[in-house]
Amino acid sequence: MIVSLNGYVLNDPTNPNSLYLDEPIDGLGLPPVRTSSGNYSGRDGGYVGSQFYGMRLITLTGFFFSSSPAALETSRRALAAAIATSSVTLNITTNGGNQYLINCNIDSLDMPILRAINKAPFKITLIATDPIIYDNSSSGSMSVTVTPARGGGITWPITWPITWAAGSQPTTVNNTGNATIYPTITLTDKMTNPTITNQTTGQFFTLTGLTTTAGDVLKIDMKNRTVLLNGGSVLPFMTSTSSWWPLLPGNNSINLTTNDGTDTTVATVSWRSGYRGI
C-alpha cells in the first residue's frame, strides 16, 4: 500500500523519502457508528434510535530510514512541513491497485528521537470529519447533464401533417460506490422556480420565487447545504418542504422541472463515488 499526505509519499520503495509504514493501519474499516439507545422501563429489552456515522480516526505508524543523520533530519522536517496545515489530503493506492481519497485534518504527529542515527519512528493521527472514503480513480469523479422534463404530444391548434413531440425521461445517475453520496448540482442560464428531484429517494429541492437570466450560474451543494447564485447565497428561496437529498448506491432517477416553457436551463449533477471502508 502506497500512501501520500498532501503529496508527500510514504511506503513507496521507488520514492527517495524512505518512509515506510508499519502494521496495523487503523481507521480504514467501517466508520464509528453514533447510536442513541436506552433500556425500556418496566419491561425487558431496549431501543436503538437513528444511527449515523461519526468522524473517522486514522492512525499511521512507521519508520524513517536514511543513509546519514543529516538526511534523516531532513526527512523529519519534510514530513512535518507536509502535514503542518489543518487540511490533509490522504491518498491511498492499495496492493490491489485501487485508489482512494480521504479528506482529513491533522490530530497529531509524534517523531521520537532514538539513539540510532539512521532510523526513527513516527506516528500520525488524522481525523476525517467526512467518514466517506472516496474513489480516486479516473472513473471516480463523475458528472451527468440533466435537461428539464417536457411533456410529449401535439401542439394546438393542430397543423397538418401532425407532429407528435416525444416526452423526456428522467436522467439516470449511477453511484458506483457502496456509500450514500451528496452531489453538487450546477444549473445555468434562464430558469423560473427550478425543482430538481431524486425520484429514487422521493425527495426534491425547490427554489420558489427565483428567476434567472442567460449567463447566470446556480450552484446547489447538497453536502455543505449551500445555494449560490453567481457566488451569492439565495438560500431564502428554498421551500420548507425541500430536502438536501443524496444519491443512493446504484441507479438514481433525477428529474428537473421549471415553471416557464421558455426556460433554457440545464443542470449538471457532479459527485465522487465513495465507500464505507476499504
Predicted ranges, named:
Residues 139-278:
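Intrinsically disordered, low-complexity segments enriched in serine, threonine, and glycine
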